[in-house]
Amino acid sequence: SLEKEATDGKFILPTEAYRGEGLSYYFAEPQDYIKIKNTDKLAEFFKERKLPYVQGRVWTTDSMLRETVNLVRKRKEEGCIAVEMELAGVQAISDFYGFELYDFLVAGDVLIEGNYETDGLSAANHDLDKLFLALQIAKSV
């Protein structure tokens, strides 16, 4: 997460992903952000089930070592609330081939200036509840 107050205890429904990786540029025209197309459908799903969520921009990067103070600050100024490693590329591929992508995230670590919190990483990466939620989403679309 880049905004702990906004994302803590909530699912993150990305609206756009900053393209800080290379894959998406092979499948979509060059631009800084790629729109995440089904975020509003997912928001309706989460709202109907009274699941806590927040919508916002995210930053896709394939290089954790380049999550520098200045780049983190810049992405936050642009409205990014989380950072992840795949979404821009997966959305670009989905758009290219005509697939529907339904993406939600859970913050496991928090990048805040001068600190890096990792307390939630294990649960975010290994909690099976997200798999069951994804299966419910797949059945409902």
Predicted regions located by residue number:
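Glycine-rich phosphate- or other oxyanion-binding loops that anchor nucleotides, phosphorylated ligands
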Residues: 1-141
